[in-house]
Swiss-Prot record:
The keyword Cell membrane applies. This is Cobalamin biosynthesis protein CbiB. Pathway: Cofactor biosynthesis; adenosylcobalamin biosynthesis. The gene is cbiB. The keyword Cell membrane applies. Converts cobyric acid to cobinamide by the addition of aminopropanol on the F carboxylic group. However, the true cosubstrate could be (R)-1-amino-2-propanol O-2-phosphate, leading to cobinamide phosphate. NCBIfam families: cobal_cbiB. Belongs to the CobD/CbiB family. One of its GO terms (molecular function) is ABC-type vitamin B12 transporter activity. It is found in: Cell membrane. GO terms for biological process: cobalamin biosynthetic process. Keywords: Cell membrane, Cobalamin biosynthesis, Membrane, Transmembrane, Transmembrane helix. It comes from the Bacteria.
Length: 319
């Protein structure tokens, strides 16, 4: 039944994704983060105090998320096994973000194909932290490809990884880790101290999933009739060409599969950030690379699900 729950949740995400106005645990986690952050900032003022308070915030948010998920699931199972199973499917469904990621990328791709640069910049600004107001088509394409490649890890592979390790409650706890990093894990002055623990722990949580993404995206590239060998080679060569210890693993693999170059200089919060280049520019990046990257994302997602199901079956057999 557990494996069936995984599969149904994955299929639901593939077909419908997260309905825009439905209640979603990430929104609840976000409200909890805002509430706890407000308390921390009220009592902590020095950088040292903010770092300690940020660590306490991380423990409270992640612990509360895991505890609530475990409690709701246990209560539902006690009421009726089928209710418990349905709640498990719903929880898994909410931690997967494949369809939402694909939709967000396509929302940028669509106006770009229609030469509506202003609209594509607006839609891109919803999913990236960089300044999009002056970006040209090539830069927009690059930003979308990077976003899909990076979020293949924390939107799909990592949730499935923690689902395999500890069931739906641990997958929900990972989502809290990821949401904390998204909200406070920045390096600029406002969040540098309070978000330090959140940023570091997100790096720790994604360490293995990011490296697994290199292998899965490389295999997916071959299955998608792209260059799987080049994806693995470039992915390995450029795996550290990023300020994050994890992001370049998936981005470099996608760059290698497509034969394009990612990274380079961008503006974040009014500051120019010069990132290393990732990949080899064997050709110019194009709008078609967005749809190719989405296919790679779905390929890696399918392979991850199959891998964890096989591992679960093998461990069950051994036990």
């Amino acid at each position: 039944m557990t494996i069936l729950a995984w599969c149904i949740a994955w299929v639901l995400d593939f077909i419908i994704g997260d309905p825009q106005h439905w209640p979603h645990p990430v929104r609840w986690i976000g409200r909890l983060i805002t509430f706890v952050q407000h308390i921390v900032r009220r009592y902590c003022h020095s950088d040292k105090a903010l770092r300690i308070g940020g660590g306490v915030m991380w423990i409270v948010v992640v612990g509360a998320t895991w505890g609530m998920a475990w409690g709701v699931l246990a209560l539902a199972q006690r009421i009726h096994p089928w209710l418990g199973w349905s709640v498990e499917v719903w929880m898994i469904f909410t931690v997967l973000a494949g369809r939402s990621l694909a939709r967000a990328a396509q929302d940028v791709e669509r106006p770009l194909r229609e030469n509506d640069l202003a609209e594509s910049r607006i839609k891109l600004s919803w999913i990236v932290g960089r300044d999009t107001s002056q970006l040209q088509p090539e830069q927009i394409n690059r930003a979308v490809v990077e976003t899909v490649a990076e979020n293949t890890v924390d939107g799909i592979i990592a949730p499935l990884f923690f689902l395999f390790l500890g069931g739906a409650p641990l997958a929900m706890a990972y989502k809290a880790v990821n949401t904390l990093d998204s909200m406070v894990g920045y390096k600029h002055e406002k969040y540098r101290a309070i978000g330090m623990v959140s940023a570091r722990m997100d790096d720790v949580a994604n360490y293995l999933p990011a490296r697994l993404s290199w292998l899965l995206l490389g295999i997916a590239a071959g299955l998608c009739r792209l260059s799987g060998w080049r994806a693995l080679r470039i992915g390995w060569r450029d795996r550290y060409n990023h300020s994050s210890p994890n992001c370049a693993w998936s981005e470099a693999c996608v760059a290698g599969a497509l034969g394009i170059q990612l990274g380079g200089p961008n503006n974040y919060f009014g500051e120019r950030v010069d990132k290393p280049w990732i990949g080899d520019a064997q050709r110019d990046i194009s709008v078609d690379d967005i749809s190719r990257t989405i296919r790679l994302m779905w390929g890696a997602s399918t392979l991850a699900l199959a891998l964890f199901i096989a591992a679960r079956c093998w461990l069950s057999g051994v036990a």
